[in-house]
């Protein structure tokens, strides 16, 4: 009988602990599969873009307290998404501390805009106006940092996304934009969006940047949604057009033959059985003899 069963009769604590670690490792791998999915990476890039829009709107527009609270809540949700992506990339690197040192420029993008506004108001109440100016400079730095985060995220996602990913992203942009604008604009008597069809028409026109101008948002939050739909629509449509042109190029010109790198060759050889390896060596020798005989 093992020591652990003698100490804990009828159960194996260490075995359960090992199984728990194995299950945890499997869950981490599953989380990795989710985080590295092209649509998730595209969603992270859109979250970075929307976070830039939120900070720009908060910095340039005079919003009432109710709208500011909603804006800060949206920003907090976006920052949580960016934090999750950053934490996963740091874990995946194998050296989280080293990764943080290399990506210090991304840290300002992870600061909620509401926290900066809270600190700024507190410092203004104490009369520390120089520090208030410093915080306003940090807000500009926040915009720049989140903008660079968006560019790096969209570049990473562009290598993996396919046609149906982009088509789905365009459709989701239209549907979510229509839903959001309808919820925000319908109660306003001055808004021209009076039905679901008006909202859907507005979302399609805005996402494709046609902009007829017959249906426009009237509320500040509606205008923020309009900016988000325009920018996300432009990004998705640009990538979609590039993907379609690449597909036609492959059809007309043909795909290049994949090269066999030394790493792929070593992996192929290591996966062979003894008989397959011997057959592989004999084939190579026959090819060498054939090549020498043709010289």
From Swiss-Prot:
Motif placement: Selectivity filter: 209-214
Family: Belongs to the potassium channel family.
Functional note: Mediates a strong voltage-dependent potassium ion permeability of excitable membranes. Assuming opened or closed conformations in response to the voltage difference across the membrane, the protein forms a potassium-selective channel through which potassium ions may pass in accordance with their electrochemical gradient.
One annotated GO molecular function: identical protein binding
The record's note on its domains: Contains a central ion-conduction pore surrounded by four voltage sensors which form the voltage-sensor paddles that move in response to membrane voltage changes through the fluid membrane interior, each voltage-sensor carrying their four positive charges across the membrane. It is thought that the S4 arginine residues move through the membrane's electric field to open the pore.
InterPro entries: Ion_trans_dom, VG_K_chnl
Principal place of residence: membrane
Membrane spanning stretches: 39-63, 68-92, 109-125, 129-145, 160-184, 222-253
Segments on the Cytoplasmic side according to the record's topology features: 1-38, 93-96, 126-128, 146-159, 254-295
Membrane-embedded but not crossing: residue ranges: 97-105, 196-208
Gene Ontology cellular component terms for the protein in this record: voltage-gated potassium channel complex
Keyword Lipoprotein: no
Subcellular locations according to the entry: Cell membrane
SUPFAM superfamilies: Voltage-gated potassium channels
GO biological process per UniProt: action potential
Keyword Secreted tagged: no
Membrane topology of the entry: Multi-pass membrane protein
Residues exposed to the Extracellular side: 64-67, 106-108, 185-195, 209-221
Higher taxonomy: Archaea, Thermoproteota, Thermoprotei, Desulfurococcales, Desulfurococcaceae
Protein name, entry field: Voltage-gated potassium channel
Keywords: Cell membrane, Ion channel, Ion transport, Membrane, Potassium, Potassium channel, Potassium transport, Transmembrane, Transmembrane helix, Transport, Voltage-gated channel
Recorded superkingdom: Archaea
